[in-house]
Amino acid sequence: MDDKELIEYFKSQMKEDPDMASAVAAIRTLLEFLKRDKGETIQGLRANLTSAIETLCGVDSSVAVSSGGELFLRFISLTSLEYSDYSKCKKIMIERGELFLRRISLSRNKIADLCHTFIKDGATILTHAYSRVVLRVLEAAVAAKKRFSVYVTESQPDLSGKKMAKALCHLNVPVTVVLDAAVGYIMEKADLVIVGAEGVVENGGIINKIGTNQMAVCAKAQNKPFYAVAESFKFVRLFPLNQQDVPDKFKYKADTLKVAQTGQDLKEEHPWVDYTAPSLITLLFTDLGVLTPSAVSDELIKLYL
């Protein structure tokens, strides 16, 4: 499976199911790559998979694709030392890969079951941009016959908040789209804030769509709970202390980074994500359970060791 086939397969997965997270599509692609690989050694197979992950990160530069790919590789590689026979080892790796995929497919429902209980009847929720996990949580709250209303930021520059509002309208949830600049104004009307995350970093902070950080700062100033929801495959080995510590490969779209390689200055570009410090986050809801930001490092160590 060459780079062109790999990219085409990844894009076809995304097109088939628009509701699928890019990281899940990347893991499906890597599993298919593993099945088709014609390598003859475990070391060669690992090298090929690492190269495939780098190729996919070049197509979709989100944090989740990078962390999901790395966790997939670690999960399937745990068996490589147990078997000396290559064909048997590869078969076990494929089985473990399929198990990993099944596990992460159930993540959103687990998170929704944990988080929707924190939404009280009659609550007013503020959310940011479009998040599939947040949407699943709100679907679970609707299914539990809870009445609530939602404010969603329009989320420039792609207006993904309007997509979220449309999805909530289909659930018959009262929803109002507000300007990104109106977060401080609208915060006093909200009872709680729920946002998704593109990545959860080692100190318990999150990397998410630009504008998340200012929302968290406003929530903290007005003593409103700020909840983040994210699947465990988004746990990434990064330890940023400020916005500048977030690598450019996560801040900008893949196309922008390619243009930057020709010499264009990235200072002219707007970043797509920002970093929210753990001190601003009340709780993180993951498929591993409900975590305080300080507990994230323990879970991350378990995942990566």
Curated annotation (Swiss-Prot):
Main location: cytoplasm
GO BP, sorted A to Z: cytoplasmic translational initiation; oligodendrocyte development; T cell receptor signaling pathway; translational initiation
Regulation: Activated by the chemical integrated stress response (ISR) inhibitor ISRIB which stimulates guanine nucleotide exchange factor activity for both phosphorylated and unphosphorylated eIF2.
Pfam families attached to this UniProt entry: IF-2B (PF01008)
Subcellular location: Cytoplasm, Cytosol
Keywords noted in UniProt: Acetylation, Cytoplasm, Initiation factor, Protein biosynthesis
UniProt keyword Acetylation, yes or no: yes
UniProt modified residues of type N6-acetyllysine: 35
Residues annotated as signal peptide: none
SUPFAM superfamilies linked to this entry: NagB/RpiA/CoA transferase-like
Quaternary structure and interacting proteins, as annotated: Component of the translation initiation factor 2B (eIF2B) complex which is a heterodecamer of two sets of five different subunits: alpha, beta, gamma, delta and epsilon. Subunits alpha, beta and delta comprise a regulatory subcomplex and subunits epsilon and gamma comprise a catalytic subcomplex. Within the complex, the hexameric regulatory complex resides at the center, with the two heterodimeric catalytic subcomplexes bound on opposite sides.
Function: Acts as a component of the translation initiation factor 2B (eIF2B) complex, which catalyzes the exchange of GDP for GTP on eukaryotic initiation factor 2 (eIF2) gamma subunit. Its guanine nucleotide exchange factor activity is repressed when bound to eIF2 complex phosphorylated on the alpha subunit, thereby limiting the amount of methionyl-initiator methionine tRNA available to the ribosome and consequently global translation is repressed.
PANTHER family xref list: TRANSLATION INITIATION FACTOR EIF-2B SUBUNIT ALPHA
Family as reported in the entry's similarity comment: Belongs to the eIF-2B alpha/beta/delta subunits family.
The protein's name in its UniProt record: Translation initiation factor eIF2B subunit alpha
The species this protein was found in: Macaca fascicularis (Crab-eating macaque)
